[in-house]
From Swiss-Prot:
Binding site for 4-CDP-2-C-methyl-D-erythritol 2-phosphate: 217-219, 243-244, 265-267, 270-274, 341-344, 348, 351
Catalytic activity reported: 2-C-methyl-D-erythritol 4-phosphate + CTP + H(+) = 4-CDP-2-C-methyl-D-erythritol + diphosphate; 4-CDP-2-C-methyl-D-erythritol 2-phosphate = 2-C-methyl-D-erythritol 2,4-cyclic diphosphate + CMP
Matching PANTHER family: 2-C-METHYL-D-ERYTHRITOL 2,4-CYCLODIPHOSPHATE SYNTHASE, CHLOROPLASTIC (PTHR43181:SF1)
EC number: 2.7.7.60, 4.6.1.12
Function: Bifunctional enzyme that catalyzes the formation of 4-diphosphocytidyl-2-C-methyl-D-erythritol from CTP and 2-C-methyl-D-erythritol 4-phosphate (MEP) (IspD), and catalyzes the conversion of 4-diphosphocytidyl-2-C-methyl-D-erythritol 2-phosphate (CDP-ME2P) to 2-C-methyl-D-erythritol 2,4-cyclodiphosphate (ME-CPP) with a corresponding release of cytidine 5-monophosphate (CMP) (IspF).
Protein name: Bifunctional enzyme IspD/IspF
Pathway: Isoprenoid biosynthesis; isopentenyl diphosphate biosynthesis via DXP pathway; isopentenyl diphosphate from 1-deoxy-D-xylulose 5-phosphate: step 2/6; Isoprenoid biosynthesis; isopentenyl diphosphate biosynthesis via DXP pathway; isopentenyl diphosphate from 1-deoxy-D-xylulose 5-phosphate: step 4/6
Record has Lyase as a keyword: yes
Span list, region 2-C-methyl-D-erythritol 4-phosphate cytidylyltransferase: 1-210
N-terminal signal peptide: none
GO terms of biological process kind: isopentenyl diphosphate biosynthetic process, methylerythritol 4-phosphate pathway; terpenoid biosynthetic process
Record-listed a divalent metal cation binding positions: D217, H219, H251
Length: 371
């Protein structure tokens, strides 16, 4: 049996996908796409190691602690080099997680030809007339390169150490004089690059699971500046002490969103000892936090927010706060509920020393079927 490790590339920014969610975090059933693709390919062979490149190791490790994770680089080649530093096997199979339907027949065809060259590469032929710079070119000379590709580990490392400008393994190895062997590819191994590509593949729909998160924050009165709640000015000079602008409602809501998505807390995302957040606009922080939540495959179902304050009175501001939060999160105000209460003069809130906010949000998986 061949000594092979598997590398799955999953650190891309999905810039061409043009959707709120990064494609590797689209949910297929309950699994993120990267995990679905990795489990599919890893089921074909007892790989020595399974290494996944990642932009957020701590988050992805929660899904599959048995895998090895490595930080992605600025380019595909740099990510691959990082992953290769963890590989000890004679051969390495490299694939993109965006190719989710790789078949066992394709895999077997690659493995069976392992001794033919330094890199075994699946390709598709071009059937349509092909034009380059207004000139027709011989389509029989064109090959569409796919993954997975099987390489001798030492050869691939050597190739990428000499140049990191290549977008696939075979061209990197060929550039240093290595031999390439092409095998017939598979239409099902199509890479998801644009959102339209999803519609051509028979993939499981995202599950209907709901994820709840809670947030709580409290700030003390004491700054001679406006009191902001949900980005709405509630009082001219009853400002709250804070590293940022003191919007305690926005802070609690950020924590609830991050909690529901399993992405940590506000202190990790926006540290209060980081000067870039000094006097920061908390609604901008909220917007950035929700963008992150969307990137990881979630969208808002609803938010329920309780403002706990003895003073000032909140009744006349609740609607404006709900509308402003909805605008920031690019949703409709019916999904944002604002409540206000006092502590009946008990505790620090009752003594009018500060304001507390309790939030609860529900998230669901982004429905990529509607793209």
């Amino acid at each position: 049996m061949l000594d092979i490790s598997l590398i799955m590339l999953s650190a891309g920014e999905s810039s061409r996908f043009n959707a709120p969610v990064k494609k590797q975090f689209l949910r297929l059933g309950e699994q993120p796409l990267w995990l679905y693709a990795t489990k599919n390919l890893s089921s074909f062979y007892p790989f020595k190691q399974i290494v996944v490149t990642s932009g957020n190791i701590s988050y992805m490790k929660k899904f599959a602690p048995e895998y090895k994770f490595v930080q992605g680089g600025a380019t595909r080649a740099q990510s691959l080099l990082n992953a290769l530093s963890m590989v000890e096997s004679e051969y390495v199979l490299v694939s993109d997680v965006a190719r989710v339907l790789i078949s066992k027949n394709l895999f077997n065809n690659i493995i069976e030809n392992h001794d033919k060259a330094d890199c075994i590469t699946p390709v598709l032929k071009v059937s349509d007339t092909t034009i380059y710079a207004q000139e027709a070119i011989d389509r029989d000379k064109i090959k569409l390169i796919q993954t997975p590709q099987l390489s001798r580990t030492s050869m691939l490392k050597k190739a990428l150490e000499q140049s990191s400008n290549f977008t696939d393994d075979s061209t990197a190895i060929q550039a240093i004089g290595g031999k390439i062997w092409y095998v017939q590819g598979d239409e099902l191994a199509k890479k998801i690059t644009f959102k339209e590509d999803l519609k051509s593949l028979n993939l499981p729909k995202p599950s209907w699971d709901i994820f709840n998160g809670n947030g709580f924050d409290v700030h003390e009165f004491g700054e001679q500046r406006a009191l902001l709640l949900g980005g709405v000015k509630v009082h001219e000079n009853m400002g709250l002490k804070a590293h940022s602008d003191g919007d305690v409602l926005a802070h609690a809501l950020i924590d609830a969103l991050l909690g529901a998505a399993g992405l940590g807390d506000i202190g990790e995302l926006f540290p209060d000892n980081d000067m870039q957040y000094k006097n920061a606009d908390s609604m901008l922080l909220l917007q950035n936090a929700y963008t992150l939540v969307q990137n990881y495959g979630f969208e808002l179902v609803n938010a329920d927010i309780t403002i706990i304050a003895q003073t000032p009175k909140m009744k006349e501001f609740k609607e404006a706060i709900a509308f402003n939060i909805a605008k920031t999160l690019k949703t409709t105000p019916n999904k944002i509920n604002i409540k206000a209460t006092t502590t009946e003069h008990l505790g620090f809130v009752g003594r009018k020393e500060g304001i507390a906010v309790l939030t609860s949000v529900n998230l669901k998986y982004f429905d990529w079927m509607k793209l």
